[in-house]
Design a protein with these regions (language model features):
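Alpha-helical transmembrane segments and membrane-interface helix-loop junctions
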Residues: 2-213
Length: 213
């Protein structure tokens, strides 16, 4: 019986070691993507605020609304959402109804949480396929008002393809798939008793980690 128990512990430890090898490069990729996403999102918010204030000034002060600010703000909002959704998902910042789950016994809570992550991964895989089709269709159409002002350097200006807007959805879903896989691995490692060997997710406090263990 002791030997059997030791084999079980050894097998569990080996599984944890394998999953840790897989999760480490994934954590590194998600860390880098998160930092870049946050920086670009701050830039997008700044541009969006400037564009909206410019439109307000022209529309209500000069009584001569510009044709492009509304679409430019929408462009920035789409990319802001696509870049920050993976960050929010990784840090547990997505809107969720947890009161029912928290009433479950701890083992059942972990099992249901893992099941929900697997379902989410399935939905995201379908979403990335639909998103890619949407991006491809976007190359056929151009924005009604957004242009690259190449006339500044003496070249012909051209309208931005809608695919660049739709790409925000595709990019966001791809990044969320990476985050989802990391969360599944973290859940499995924690369930097997290796939670203390996991590196803390940037942006999550130690108290939050203790509540998940």
């Amino acid at each position: 019986a002791i030997a059997l128990g030791q084999r079980k512990v050894g097998g569990r430890s080996s599984m944890i070691d394998v999953m840790l090898i897989v999760i480490r490069p994934l954590q590194w990729v998600n860390d880098i993507a998160g930092r870049i996403g946050r920086a670009l999102s701050v830039f997008a918010i700044a541009v969006m605020v400037i564009v909206i204030l410019t439109q307000v000034f022209f529309r209500y002060v000069l009584n001569n609304a510009l044709p492009w600010p509304d679409e430019a703000a929408r462009f920035m909002m789409l990319w802001l959402t696509g870049l920050m959704a993976p960050v929010a998902m990784r840090q547990g910042g997505m809107v969720a109804i947890t009161s029912v789950l928290e009433s479950f016994p701890r083992p059942l809570f972990k099992l249901v949480s893992l099941l929900l992550l697997v379902i989410s991964l399935t939905v995201l895989i379908v979403g990335v396929q639909l998103g890619w089709k949407h991006v491809n269709s976007g190359w056929l159409f151009s924005s009604s008002s957004l242009k690259i002002p190449m006339s500044i350097v003496g070249l012909k200006s051209f309208k931005i393809k809608l695919a660049w807007m739709y790409m925000s959805l595709f990019t966001g879903i791809c990044l969320m798939i990476l985050v989802n896989v990391e969360l599944i691995l973290r859940s499995l490692i924690t369930s097997l008793g290796g939670g203390q060997r996991l590196r803390q997710v940037p942006g999550i406090s130690g108290d939050s980690l203790e509540s998940e263990a």
